[in-house]
């Protein structure tokens, strides 16, 4: 199935020259991504219902054929717009965007019958009885478990299904889900409809509150058509997603237990619940699972990414015997206990969207929305006289938005409301209604005189000056083929005919022109340069701070031993240290890349990326980079790709569990593709699905972490810019081959493991030599990141508990003593010789 987002519907009014088919215009609300063929099917279905009610008012219709009616097969009809036949595969948004940008405007389409067969291979036949009576709905409900989000597909729900029925269905599904293991909610079977606090349909901008007043009964009577805003499903296999916010609580039996105690979590990360009721037999794994369920920054957090620290001691999941550690083994106090929680830094980025707002603000649905009908007291005061320029300057600063939150950008073009045939209202540009009786004559060098027709509203004569409107200036620029500079303190002609100063003017009407000119000059010479240079100033300050912060130790060494060296060597060493710091500080590079917009993906680059992915040109080396890049894994693990991932797992025989996060299966998919067990097409298919989803939702509230998305797009764009190695010159071909082999065999990692000092095993002289070599090696790019990874890996290895002495003895005995005496290959029996003790 394909997921569709709830968008502003396209509105159509359908008429036909055949009065027997459509007696009164049909009004239809359709999804913008639906096709003309789908709309034609729905219109045909509506006509079929009306004719069946007329010709068979009391009979039970058993088939789709109605005898003696003017309705024929759907393939004999077509829709036309402004006399042009519309293709059945044309999207409805392409009709509205080209001619009627206003979504509230109805588009007139005509239904006509073909005089001859079209010969099209596109068959529009459909099931008249059940095609347009239902929709597919998917539920997403938050849970108190490691899975965080529960998905449930509800196929073929009647379009008359009310919100009250949807709430009951969601309640039934969450009750069934919480019967499974791993759920920490203590309510379970006692959940009621009142626990549903609100919901939102994916694609809409604002959520809908539930159970907050008497008006909730009205909302609960709304059906799917009212909620989504369209009359029919945009495709046969389409579905919409309802995201419900549900209230969950911890187990009340534990809270009332006398032996229980409370863990209070202290962490820099945001947790939706900061306390946990535990019993003496609660394990450390269960505590980590609880933290995974209440962590607000990521949906893919695992136990291995969490560290619990109590009074400086790390709480391990397993004890030395290999059994699960209980929380009571570390904590003996019977009262509230503070436990520090440390989260892996890879999961500190907060993702956008509805669930992020819910997890970061658990009280988002706790309050009734403000009543817009209530009014606050208004104090009336006499207004001071202000110039029209000041008023218009304030109007330009007021942002206007639609009900859905989209910005409204006013233009300079004026329209006049007109009436056609006494009832139809249209808006026509003023320039089309005014006769072109005036011309602007311009002498352009050797080309002679150029005449530009303008209307009377586009110019005013003020003494020796001609004031032009913005539209007239654009005509003049187009005719002369150059740009006219507009000074901020100039006077322009507003389209309404008023003279308006282009400069910001906040002075009153009785200020003189000298004060206005002085203020404009001050803004132009002082305020504007300071305002424009402020971002650059912040970048420079941040850069100097990072250089100084990362160069404290080298500058301290120079300060202490500088008296032994000449000044020229001190300056040279200082410059060398500064160069080294800038080279190895990734934050400085990222800071200037963002300021200079070097990492931005424009439409041209995005088109190249899309074409590169669709051509299956991604290489195994690229997929290897993606496997080692956590941001790429997080993007492929978004909930919207859940069905596509499961489809790939099923296609290539990868075992998976639909009730648990499939991060392990995704990593296994990468491993099998890189090892050659599975063809590369598996990952190609998954990446195509991801970018199809991203292209659909990129202009809306994004579902993806922006930094991670930009990183992945840059990786793909750089991959697409790589030239074929066979087309390069010989010296570059040799260099590329050498770099590829070094990267493939991880030569840098191997060298660094020998260079980085090991305090446990290295002697003093060896450590000094390694530190000296490491100092110069860190001048190379990307070495610092590799260095941090290796040091962190060594620290994790040291934290692993060593086997006890008894276990080591048992392993040694198992290696020495055979289990049973079996004959050898020569037929002789083996004997164990144990020397006598002295």
From Swiss-Prot:
**Key word Transmembrane helix present:** yes
Fetch the PROSITE patterns from UniProt: UBIQUITIN_2 (PS50053)
All ranges on the Extracellular side of the membrane? 560-563
Q: Which UniProt keywords apply?
A: Endoplasmic reticulum, Membrane, Phosphoprotein, Transmembrane, Transmembrane helix
User: GO biological process annotations for this chain's record?
Assistant: ERAD pathway; mRNA splicing, via spliceosome; positive regulation of protein autoubiquitination
* Region annotation Important for HRD1 oligomer formation: where it falls in the sequence: 319-418
Region of interest called Required for ERAD-L function and HRD1 oligomer formation, as start-end residue ranges on this chain: 437-490
Molecular-function GO terms, alphabetical = identical protein binding; molecular adaptor activity
**Membrane topology value:** Multi-pass membrane protein
Positions of region (Required for ERAD-L function)? 31-240
- Explain the consequences of disrupting this gene: Impaired degradation of proteins with misfolded lumenal domains such as CPY*, a mutant, misfolded form of carboxypeptidase Y which is a known ERAD-L substrate. Impaired degradation of proteins with misfolded intramembrane domains. Impaired trans-ubiquitination and degradation of the HRD1 ligase. Degradation of proteins with misfolded cytosolic domains is not affected. Interaction of substrate with HRD1 is reduced; in USA1 and YOS9 double mutants this interaction is completely abolished.
Cellular compartments per GO CC: endoplasmic reticulum; endoplasmic reticulum membrane; Hrd1p ubiquitin ligase complex
Q: Positions of the region Interaction with HRD1?
A: 345-535
Q: Where is each Ubiquitin-like domain found? A: 259-318
What InterPro entries is this protein classified in? Answer: Ubiquitin-like_dom, Ubiquitin-like_domsf
**Biological function:** Scaffold protein of the endoplasmic reticulum-associated degradation (ERAD) (also known as endoplasmic reticulum quality control, ERQC) pathway involved in ubiquitin-dependent degradation of misfolded endoplasmic reticulum proteins. Component of the HRD1 ubiquitin ligase complex, which is part of the ERAD-L and ERAD-M pathways responsible for the rapid degradation of soluble lumenal and membrane proteins with misfolded lumenal domains (ERAD-L), or ER-membrane proteins with misfolded transmembrane domains (ERAD-M).
| Additional remark text | Present with 1890 molecules/cell in log phase SD medium.
Its quaternary structure? Component of the HRD1 ubiquitin ligase complex which contains the E3 ligase HRD1, its cofactors HRD3, USA1 and DER1, substrate recruiting factor YOS9 and CDC48-binding protein UBX2. Within the complex, interacts directly with HRD1 (via N-terminus) and DER1 (via C-terminus) and indirectly with HRD3. In ERAD-L, HRD3 and YOS9 jointly bind misfolded glycoproteins in the endoplasmic reticulum (ER) lumen.
What does its UniProt record remark on the domains? The ubiquitin-like domain is required for HRD1 trans-ubiquitination and degradation. Reported to be involved in ERAD-M but not ERAD-L function. However, a contradictory report states that it is not required for either ERAD-L or ERAD-M function. Reported to be required for HRD1 oligomer formation. However, a contradictory report does not observe any defects in oligomerization following deletion of the domain.
Q: What is this protein called?
A: U1 SNP1-associating protein 1
Q: Which organism is it from?
A: Saccharomyces cerevisiae (strain ATCC 204508 / S288c) (Baker's yeast)
Taxonomic lineage = Eukaryota, Fungi, Dikarya, Ascomycota, Saccharomycotina
């Amino acid at each position: 199935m394909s997921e569709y987002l709830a968008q502003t519907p396209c509105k159509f009014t359908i008429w036909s020259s055949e009065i027997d088919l459509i007696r009164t215009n049909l009004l239809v609300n359709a999804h913008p991504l639906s096709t003309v063929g789908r709309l034609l099917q729905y219109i045909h279905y509506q006509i079929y219902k009306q004719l069946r009610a007329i010709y068979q008012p009391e009979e039970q219709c058993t088939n789709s054929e109605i005898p003696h009616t003017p309705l024929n097969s759907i393939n004999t009809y077509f829709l036309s717009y402004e006399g042009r036949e519309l293709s059945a595969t044309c999207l409805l948004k392409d009709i509205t965007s080209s001619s009627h940008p206003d979504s509230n405007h109805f588009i007139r389409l005509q239904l006509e019958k073909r005089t001859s067969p079209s010969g099209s291979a596109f068959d529009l036949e459909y099931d008249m009885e059940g095609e347009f009576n239902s929709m597919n709905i998917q539920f997403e409900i938050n849970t108190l478990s490691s899975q965080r989000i529960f998905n449930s597909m509800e196929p073929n729900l009647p379009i008359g299904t009310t919100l009250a029925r949807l709430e009951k269905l969601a309640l039934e599904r969450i009750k069934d889900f919480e019967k499974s293991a791993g759920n920490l909610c203590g309510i379970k079977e006692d959940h009621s409809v009142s626990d549903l606090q609100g919901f939102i349909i994916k694609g809409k901008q604002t959520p809908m509150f539930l159970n907050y007043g008497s008006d909730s009964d009205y909302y609960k009577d709304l059906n799917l058509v009212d909620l989504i805003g369209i009359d029919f499903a945009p495709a046969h296999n389409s579905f919409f997603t309802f995201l419900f916010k549900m209230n969950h609580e911890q187990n009340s039996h534990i809270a009332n237990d006398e032996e229980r105690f409370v863990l209070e979590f202290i962490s820099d990360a945001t947790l939706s619940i900061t306390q946990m009721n535990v019993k003496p037999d609660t394990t450390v794994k269960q505590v980590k699972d609880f933290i995974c369920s209440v962590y607000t920054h990521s949906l893919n957090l695992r136990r291995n990414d969490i560290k619990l620290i109590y009074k400086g001691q790390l709480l391990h999941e397993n004890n030395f015997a290999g059994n699960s550690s209980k929380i009571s083994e570390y904590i003996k106090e019977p009262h509230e206990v503070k436990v520090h929680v440390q989260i892996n830094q890879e999961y500190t980025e907060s993702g956008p969207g509805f669930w992020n707002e819910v997890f970061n603000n658990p009280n988002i649905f706790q309050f009734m929305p403000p009543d817009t009908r209530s009014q606050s007291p208004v104090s009336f005061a006499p207004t001071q006289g202000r110039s029209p320029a000041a008023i218009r300057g304030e109007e330009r600063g007021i942002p206007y938005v639609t009900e859905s939150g989209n910005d409204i950008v006013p233009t300079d073009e004026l329209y006049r409301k007109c009436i056609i045939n006494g009832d139809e209202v249209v808006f026509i540009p003023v320039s089309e209604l005014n006769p072109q009786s005036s011309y602007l004559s311009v002498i352009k060098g050797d080309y002679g005189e150029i005449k530009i027709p303008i209307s009377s509203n586009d110019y005013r004569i003020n003494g020796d000056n001609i004031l032009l409107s913005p539209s007239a200036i654009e005509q003049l620029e187009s005719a002369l083929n150059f740009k006219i500079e507009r000074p901020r303190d100039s006077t322009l002609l507003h389209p309404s005919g008023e003279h308006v100063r282009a400069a910001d003017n906040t002075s009153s009407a009785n200020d003189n022109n000298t004060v206005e000119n002085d203020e404009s000059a001050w803004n132009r010479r002082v305020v504007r340069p300071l305002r424009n240079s402020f971002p650059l100033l912040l970048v420079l300050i941040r850069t100097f701070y990072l250089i100084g912060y990362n160069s404290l130790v080298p500058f301290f060494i120079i300060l202490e031993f500088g008296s032994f060296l000449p000044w020229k060597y001190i300056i040279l060493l200082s410059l060398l240290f500064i160069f080294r710091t800038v080279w190895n500080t990734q934050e400085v590079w990222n800071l200037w890349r963002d300021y200079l917009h070097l990492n931005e993906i424009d439409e041209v680059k995005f088109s190249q990326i899309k074409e590169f992915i669709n051509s299956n040109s991604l290489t195994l080396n690229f997929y290897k980079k993606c496997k080692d890049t956590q941001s790429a894994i997080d993007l492929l693990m978004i909930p919207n790709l859940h069905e596509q991932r499961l489809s790939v797992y099923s296609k290539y025989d990868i075992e998976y569990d639909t009730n648990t996060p499939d991060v392990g299966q995704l990593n296994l998919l990468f491993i099998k593709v890189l090892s050659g067990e599975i063809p590369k097409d598996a990952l190609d298919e998954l990446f195509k699905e991801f970018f199809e989803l991203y292209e659909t939702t990129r202009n809306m509230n994004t579902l993806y972490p922006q930094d991670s998305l930009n990183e992945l797009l840059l990786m793909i764009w750089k991959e697409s810019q790589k030239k074929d190695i066979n087309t390069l010159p010989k010296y570059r071909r040799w260099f590329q081959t050498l770099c590829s082999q070094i990267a493939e065999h991880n030569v840098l990692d191997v060298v660094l493991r020998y260079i980085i000092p090991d305090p446990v095993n290295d002697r003093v002289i060896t450590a000094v030599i390694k530190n000296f070599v490491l100092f110069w090696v860190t001048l190379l790019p990307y070495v610092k990141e590799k260095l941090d990874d290796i040091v962190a890996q060594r620290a994790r290895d040291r934290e692993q508990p060593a086997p006890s002495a008894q276990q080591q003895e048992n392993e040694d005995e198992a290696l020495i003593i055979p289990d049973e005496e079996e004959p050898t290959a020569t037929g002789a029996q083996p004997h164990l010789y144990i020397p006598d003790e002295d």
